[in-house]
Amino acid sequence: STLLASSAASDVYKRQSVMRFFENTRKPQGFGGKLMTKMMNSGHAKLSQWGFSNISAKSDAEVLDVGCGGGANIAVWLDRCRNGHVTGMDYSRVSVAESQKLNAAAIKQGKCNVVQGDVSAIPFSDATFDYVSAFETVYFWPGLVKCFSEVNRVLKSEGIFLICNESDGTNAADEKWTKMINGMKIYTSKQLVAALKEAGFTEIKTYSNAKNHWISIVATK
């Protein structure tokens, strides 16, 4: 019985350790957080590529990538907007530092900066950006309409908000993540579109990859 008890305790500890590690998807912290940002950069690459294929970007655009994680999508934006400027924002210090590291050359050239900030109170003036992107992050946003309204505020007139999620809310298997990660909520495209409309977006296009249960939404101010 002692062996059984210690085995059960070990299983609980392992489960808790795994859950602690996956909490880093919400807010990367410490060494586990650094590791997670690198995993995000590689693990989300195909999704990001697909999401980016749904928009065309002006080469001189002013861009904000919210929830920038490890900074890989900042790098893609920089490549697409060679004469523009890209800002990354995340509420995790680890993510900010990792994104700065990955995009150090562009930061040195004055084409990029990465800031710590909260999407429910974006630290920028009205009508600052041509594009705002959110890859694999809206699951964790505290109140969609409020956060989407903030995105709407910082976008210029006819500015574009790109959302990209690898869970479309129709795959029961994805619910395991909401049990594992505190504060995570998976939305359907219908729910996202309703919140975007309420936040003041006018033209909203949805794209889906049914095979992978991916969704991408392009909303115009």
Label every model-predicted segment.
Residues 131-144:
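A short SAM/SAH-binding and catalytic strip from SAM-dependent methyltransferases
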Residues 145-157:
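A short glycine-rich, Lys/Arg-flanked "PGG" loop and its adjoining helix->strand segment in the class I
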Residues 120-131:
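A short acidic, Gly/Pro-enriched loop at the edge of an enzyme's catalytic core
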Residues 42-61, 76:
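Conserved alpha-helix/loop element of class I SAM-dependent methyltransferases that forms part
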Residues 55-57, 80-81, 155:
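A generic alpha-to-beta junction signature in SAM-dependent methyltransferases
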Residues 62-121:
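Class I SAM-dependent methyltransferase SAM/SAH-binding core
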Residues 1-13:
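Single conserved hydrophobic/aromatic residue that forms the stacking wall/gate
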Residues 15-41, 45, 160-218:
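C-terminal alpha-helical "lid/dimerization" subdomain adjacent to the S-adenosyl-L-methionine
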